[in-house]
Amino acid sequence: IVCHTTATSPISAVTCPPGENLCYRKMCDAICSSRGKVVELGCAATCPSKKPYEEVTCCSNDKCNPHPKQRPG
């Protein structure tokens, strides 16, 4: 599976390692950073757990986790 990741700068699409078959998007509201919302994108074997102030979305299609300000594709 190919997922968008914030582990690189700029954000790019990477092929996930074996065993990591999910893409995720984790967004944290302003409580996490003085700069506003924090967005984390990447690959995962299981959907990351969510804290009360976070929104976590997981999916299993290529590039299904775009940055909220990025157009899909």
Swiss-Prot record:
Localization terms from the record: Secreted
> In this record, what's one Pfam family?
Toxin_cobra-type
Write down the species. Bungarus candidus (Malayan krait)
What is annotated about its quaternary structure and interactions? Monomer in solution, homodimer in crystal state.
Q: Function, please?
A: Binds with high affinity to muscular (alpha-1/CHRNA1) and neuronal (alpha-7/CHRNA7) nicotinic acetylcholine receptor (nAChR) and inhibits acetylcholine from binding to the receptor, thereby impairing neuromuscular and neuronal transmission. Mice injected with this toxin develop flaccid paralysis followed by death. Irreversibly inhibits twitches in a concentration-dependent manner in rat phrenic nerve-hemidiaphragm and chick biventer cervicis muscle.
InterPro entries this protein is in? Snake_3FTx, Snake_toxin-like_sf, Snake_toxin_con_site, Toxin_cobra-type
Where would one find the signal peptide in this protein?
Answer: none
Q: Which GO terms describe its cellular component?
A: extracellular region
Keywords, A to Z, come to: Acetylcholine receptor inhibiting toxin, Disulfide bond, Ion channel impairing toxin, Neurotoxin, Postsynaptic neurotoxin, Secreted, Toxin
Q: Which cysteines are joined by disulfide bonds?
A: C3-C23, C16-C43, C28-C32, C47-C58, C59-C64
Q: Does the keyword Disulfide bond apply?
A: yes
The name this protein goes by in its record: Alpha-bungarotoxin N3
Please state the protein's primary subcellular location.
secreted
Q: Which CDD domains match?
A: TFP_snake_toxin
**What does the tissue specificity note say?**
Expressed by the venom gland.
**What is the top-level taxon of the source organism?**
Eukaryota
Keyword Disulfide bond in the entry? The reply is yes
Q: Which GO terms describe its molecular function?
A: acetylcholine receptor inhibitor activity; ion channel regulator activity; toxin activity
Q: Of which family is this protein a member?
A: Belongs to the three-finger toxin family. Long-chain subfamily. Type II alpha-neurotoxin sub-subfamily.
